[in-house]
Amino acid sequence: MPRVKRGVTARARHQKIFALAKGYRGRRKNVYRVAKQAVMKAGQYAYRDRRQRKRQFRQLWIVRINAGARENGLSYSKFMNGLKRASIEIDRKVLADLAVFDKAAFAQLVEKAKAALAA
């Protein structure tokens, strides 16, 4: 049985890691053992942060909705309760955009929420 020399496969494996480590600083970009660890850690961060991004955007939307609601004399929780009672189903992303970019439309929603709370 002939001897198998693995130089080609080893080089291909290394090149794959170096391609993923492109743009890194110091030895992380050109020393295989360090680059491999850096790429693995980057993958862990990416996996974790794809989930955190969803939480962070929801937090941001809630902050913006709360600010817009308080400008119109209502807290976030009362505003959301009023919308639910008025059977207005708009998600937080759209509400946050309205609060920032279309204050008049958002003010109308706040008035409808106030009316639903009073009824």
Swiss-Prot record:
Q: Name one GO biological process term.
A: ribosomal large subunit assembly
Q: A Pfam family for this UniProt protein? A: Ribosomal_L20
Q: Name one GO molecular function term.
A: rRNA binding
Query: What domain of life does the UniProt record list for this protein's source?
Result: Bacteria
InterPro entries attached to this UniProt entry: Ribosomal_bL20 (IPR005813), RIBOSOMAL_L20_CS (IPR049946), Ribosomal_protein_bL20_C (IPR035566)
Q: List, alphabetically, the GO terms of the cellular component aspect.
A: ribonucleoprotein complex; ribosome
Protein keywords: Ribonucleoprotein, Ribosomal protein, RNA-binding, rRNA-binding
- Protein family (similarity comment): Belongs to the bacterial ribosomal protein bL20 family.
PANTHER family on file: 39S RIBOSOMAL PROTEIN L20
Function, as annotated, reads: Binds directly to 23S ribosomal RNA and is necessary for the in vitro assembly process of the 50S ribosomal subunit. It is not involved in the protein synthesizing functions of that subunit.
What is this protein's name? Large ribosomal subunit protein bL20
- List the top taxonomic levels of the source: Bacteria, Pseudomonadati, Pseudomonadota, Betaproteobacteria, Neisseriales
